[in-house]
Amino acid sequence: MFRNVKELIEITKEKQILISDVMIAQEMEVTEKTKEDIFQQMDHNLSVMEAAVQKGLEGVTSQTGLTGGDAVKLQAYIRSGKSLSGPLILDAVSKAVATNEVNAAMGTICATPTAGSAGVVPGTLFAVKEKLNPTREQMIRFLFTAGAFGFVVANNASISGAAGGCQAEVGSASGMAAAAIVEMAGGTPEQSAEAMAITLKNMLGLVCDPVAGLVEVPCVKRNAMGASNAMIAADMALAGITSRIPCDEVIDAMYKIGQTMPTALRETGQGGLAATPTGRELEKKIFGGALGSRETTSAN
């Protein structure tokens, strides 16, 4: 079993296998299930993600009315041919938004690694699918690779907004996606680690400040940024660009930053955007009562 990214990469070198292979082997060891059973479960997760993306692209709106319809707008904008950032990145962004809009509308999603950050991995996966035309097995392996890096973060830092801010949720998801994109594109395990490091460095310090304590504002749009961040970081790593700070040290830095982050900025809905005049008005409109007094339990 690997405990950090360094050990993960060492295993791939020693055995001449992919990161996804290492994660699959670990799952087999821990769960005592066959490879076929593990693939079947991950295939189910993939199907859930695919359905969520499709539903979101058809258009959904949350019960509060705070979020919904933006994925549809983005797809229309892509078709217009006017996009500045290019169709592939915007496709990833729109599919990330689609997933989180479904989550906000009480639909079914697959937490990657949390519900609040569930759009980044499927958003990038189904966008890259259009360019690389992967097999179903390669798409499933994408999820195992992402999971390997998520496993390291969860065991050495945090994937919880309440513990580490949004950097721990969307930041982790973005890094996981970047690493998986690299493997799917034919990059090396070392490049996957570089992609994770580059991605996460750019999310450090991101707070968790959900308006009204709901996983809507700014969570949905942060998934959009997480998806675009992952795509850019993956390209940088594939181009041979490296992080001066090793991946494990970046993860440790994220953990320490989260430990020093004020409680008001860790999912409580007491600070940041949640505490703005508009944020408080939206909270009052949705829930009524004294502003800022409601105990929040939703993840960012």
From Swiss-Prot:
Record keyword Oxidoreductase present: no
Cofactor note: Binds 1 [4Fe-4S] cluster.
Endpoints of the signal sequence: none
Reaction(s) the record says it catalyses: L-serine = pyruvate + NH4(+)
Keywords tagged on the record: 4Fe-4S, Gluconeogenesis, Iron, Iron-sulfur, Lyase, Metal-binding
A GO BP entry: gluconeogenesis
Pathway: Carbohydrate biosynthesis; gluconeogenesis
Short name of any one Pfam family annotated for the protein: SDH_alpha
Record carries keyword NADP: no
EC number of the protein: 4.3.1.17
MF (Gene Ontology): 4 iron, 4 sulfur cluster binding; L-serine ammonia-lyase activity; metal ion binding
Enzyme class: lyase
Names of required cofactors: [4Fe-4S] cluster
The family this protein is said to belong to: Belongs to the iron-sulfur dependent L-serine dehydratase family.
Subunit structure: Heterodimer of an alpha chain and a beta chain.
Protein's UniProt name: Probable L-serine dehydratase, alpha chain
Taxon lineage: Bacteria, Bacillati, Bacillota, Bacilli, Bacillales
